[in-house]
Design a protein with these regions (language model features):
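Short S/T/G/P-rich N-terminal loop/turn motif that feeds into the first structured element of a domain
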Residues: 1-192
Length: 192
C-alpha cells in the first residue's frame, strides 16, 4: 500500500483539484486475506468530478496508472449520490461505515430513514444515498462517519427512544429492502 500511496500522492499533489472535489485512499477495516484491502473515493459535485476525470490523462497520469496497476487490481466500481444528509461533523474522521441495500420502494425506505434520524443522534454525520451504478444490484446505502474508534465501536441506539426508532425502521424496511452487508473503512490520505 505504501508504493501505491506514494504514486497517488505524487500525482494528486501535482494537479489542481477542481472546486469541491477530493480523492481519498481508504483502508478496509479488517479485510480478509485475498479480499479488497483499499478503496479510492472520488467525491464532489458532478461538474467537479467531470473536470477531475479530464485531468486524469496525459503522460503523468499514464505513468501513475501504470505504476498502480503493478500492485493493485480494480475489483469493483460504484458511484452514488447523497439523497439525505443528517448534519454532524465530518472533521477528524477516524473511520466510516457503509451499509448497502437493495430497495424495492425508495419512497418508503427514505421516509423510514428520515423518521429514524429524527430520534437517533449520532456524533458524526449520516447520509442516505442512492447508487447510480454498482455491481450486485444494490440500489441504496446508508453512510456514517466516526470521529474516533470509540464512536465507531459504540455506534447504535443508546436510549429507549432510539431503540424504538431503530425497531420501527427495521420493521418498516424489512419487507421493501434486502440488506447486502456493510464495510468499514479508515482514511489513509485525502487530496483536495
Amino acid at each position: 500500500a505504501g508504493y501505491v500511496l506514494n504514486l497517488m500522492d505524487d500525482f494528486y499533489s501535482s494537479i489542481e483539484m477542481p472546486e469541491g472535489t477530493s480523492v481519498s485512499l481508504e483502508a478496509l477495516y479488517h479485510s480478509a486475506e485475498g479480499s479488497p484491502s483499499h478503496i479510492m473515493n472520488f467525491i464532489g459535485p458532478v461538474d467537479g468530478l467531470i473536470a477531475l476525470r479530464a485531468l486524469r490523462s496525459g503522460d503523468a497520469y499514464d505513468a501513475y496508472n501504470t505504476g498502480v496497476e503493478k500492485f493493485a487490481t480494480i475489483l469493483s466500481i460504484k458511484a452514488g449520490k447523497t439523497l439525505a444528509r443528517i448534519p454532524g461533523t465530518d472533521e477528524n474522521v477516524f473511520g466510516a461505515q457503509e451499509w448497502s441495500f437493495n430497495v424495492k420502494d425508495q419512497v418508503k425506505f427514505g421516509a423510514a430513514f428520515v423518521e429514524l434520524m429524527k430520534v437517533f443522534k449520532p456524533t458524526g454525520y449520516v447520509s442516505l444515498g442512492q447508487y447510480t451504478h454498482g455491481e450486485k444490484g444494490e440500489t441504496h446505502y446508508i453512510y456514517s462517519m466516526y470521529n474516533d474508534q470509540a464512536a465507531m465501536l459504540n455506534f447504535g441506539p443508546k436510549t429507549e427512544a432510539e431503540i424504538s426508532a431503530f425497531n420501527k425502521f427495521f420493521s418498516k424496511t424489512s419487507a421493501i429492502s434486502e440488506y447486502n452487508g456493510s464495510r468499514t473503512t479508515v482514511p489513509v490520505k485525502t487530496w483536495n
